[in-house]
Regions:
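Short Gly/Ser/Thr- and Asp/Glu-enriched loop/turn motifs at secondary-structure junctions
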Residues: 98-102, 137-140, 277-281, 332-336
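Short loop/turn motifs enriched for small/polar and acidic residues
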Residues: 137-139, 287, 340-344, 387
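Short, hydrophobic beta-strand segments
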Residues: 103-108, 301-307, 350-356
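Gly/Gly-Pro- and Ser/Thr-rich, intrinsically disordered tail segments characteristic of DNA damage-repair
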Residues: 1-221, 225-227, 270, 360-416
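C-terminal hydrophobic structural anchor segments
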Residues: 321-376
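Short, charged/polar surface micro-motifs in flexible loops or helix N-caps
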Residues: 10, 33-36, 289-292, 344-348
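Short, charged/polar, Gly/Pro-enriched secondary-structure boundary elements
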Residues: 111-115, 293, 345-352
Length: 416
């Protein structure tokens, strides 16, 4: 049996941990620069606040219902995530951390999976303050279905074992709620009269493969209780790493934009080294403010490959600037830009290229020194000059909560 652990409304729940008075009150977390909604409590969802919605469009709703807004605090969320999964992975033969708020657990050998899940859920809530849902079934895809139902259950746990019951559930499950069926596939399937998971199971497998490729076919077989996706033990390797920002003040100067792109590339490099990984390609994108239809509109994107998969800041930043030069156009005011690293592989799997003249050992030593100094003394104590000497590069976060668990100055004091 496979279990899916899913932290409920994770970012919003993290903000509530240290503010218990917000329990049962509407809470929402905003993206960088406090631009869009990226997490909502159930109360905020009930009020009609939607994911990805620009918050300036909902000022009246926020005021009328006193929705509590928070700037995203990823240092806090990442630390609480680690605490949650340290607890759930104990006494489990294998587990896979799928995302910051989800993990798959191997429940083989557990005599009473439902009772174990109920106990685990209570333990996580008691030890961290984070509510979780647990879905249990034969495969990863079915555990996702069980997790979807667990969120609607008062107990927060759903165990799908009886195959007739599973068939009944799939007959009511909307096709767009299946793991791996995004909006594009859902629209396409509905055109063929496929509205539920059971409708999809009744289709010919050759047709499914043609419509949804081999991954889609495996997903459908998993709905039939046939395992196809094994656990990738520990923490899954990210497929891509992106750093991007919506600018509070639009950028219309190349030098300023190149400083931001340089800093984005540096951030991506740090994250990459934190994963003990290297990237094979890089892309840069930028675009104007689409919410100003009367302004001149432009969007640019360019991608390049490294000769050899890289993780050092200097190599990555150089190529990021090359990409920027390909797409930058004068005369526009840019609202958002970003850098994405893709083709990510473990550092120990990198194959050297004949065309690579860089001294890899020297670069690795330099990056280790840079990371150590910045880790001990504070971020950007050492940085590339291309990111701006006097550029403080501060993200607009007017509603940022303290880093209660990762910064000594923010630790709560208790009076006894």
């Amino acid at each position: 049996m496979i279990a899916l652990v899913d932290c409920n409304n994770f970012y919003a729940s993290c903000e509530r941990v240290f503010r218990p008075h917000l329990e049962n009150k509407p809470v929402a977390v905003l993206s960088n620069n406090d631009g869009c909604v990226i997490a909502r409590s159930n109360e905020s969802k009930a009020l009609g606040l939607k994911m990805g919605e620009p918050i300036f469009k909902k000022r009246e709703l926020v005021r009328r219902h006193n929705i509590h807004l928070f700037s995203s605090n990823f240092a806090l969320y990442g630390d609480i995530s680690k605490r949650v999964f340290d607890i759930v992975s104990k006494n489990i033969p294998a587990y896979e951390i799928y995302s910051i708020d989800e993990a798959f657990l191997d429940f083989r050998g557990i005599k009473d999976p439902y009772a174990f899940a109920v106990h685990l859920r209570r333990k996580v809530k008691q030890w961290t303050g984070i509510p979780i849902s647990i879905g249990i079934s034969y495969t990863k895809t079915l555990s996702k279905v069980a997790g979807y139902l667990a969120k609607k259950s008062p107990e927060g746990v759903c165990y799908l074992q009886d195959k007739k019951h599973i068939s009944d559930i799939l007959g009511r499950l909307p096709v767009d709620e299946i793991w791996g069926v995004g909006m594009r596939y859902a629209i396409k399937l509905k055109k063929y009269g496929i509205h539920t998971a059971k409708n999809l199971l009744e289709c010919d497998e050759t047709w499914i493969r043609k419509m949804m490729n081999v991954v889609g076919l495996r997903m459908v077989r998993e709905l039939k209780c046939i395992p196809h996706f094994s656990l990738e033990e520990g923490r899954s390797m990210k497929k891509s790493i992106c750093t991007s920002r919506s600018f509070s003040v639009e950028i219309s100067d190349y030098t300023r934009m190149s400083e931001y792109i340089s800093m984005f590339a540096s951030r991506c490099s740090e994250k990459l080294r934190g994963e003990a990984a290297c990237a094979r390609s890089i892309s840069v994108f930028m675009y104007t403010n689409r919410f100003k239809p009367k302004a001149r509109q432009y969007s640019g994107y360019f991608s390049m490959d490294f000769h050899t998969a890289a993780s050092d800041t200097i190599t990555i930043t150089k190529l990021a600037i090359e990409c920027l030069k390909k797409i930058y156009r004068s005369g526009y005011s840019y609202k958002k830009a970003g850098v994405t690293l893709s083709g990510i592989i473990p550092r120990n799997q990198v194959q050297l290229s004949l065309f690579d003249s860089a001294d890899r050992k020297k670069a690795d030593t330099l990056m280790q020194t840079l990371d150590k100094i910045n880790g001990n003394m504070g971020r950007d104590i050492l940085k590339l000059s291309s990111s701006g000497i006097n550029n403080k590069w501060k993200i607009g976060k007017e509603r940022l909560s303290p880093c209660y668990t990762t910064r000594w100055s923010d630790i709560l004091s208790v009076r006894v």
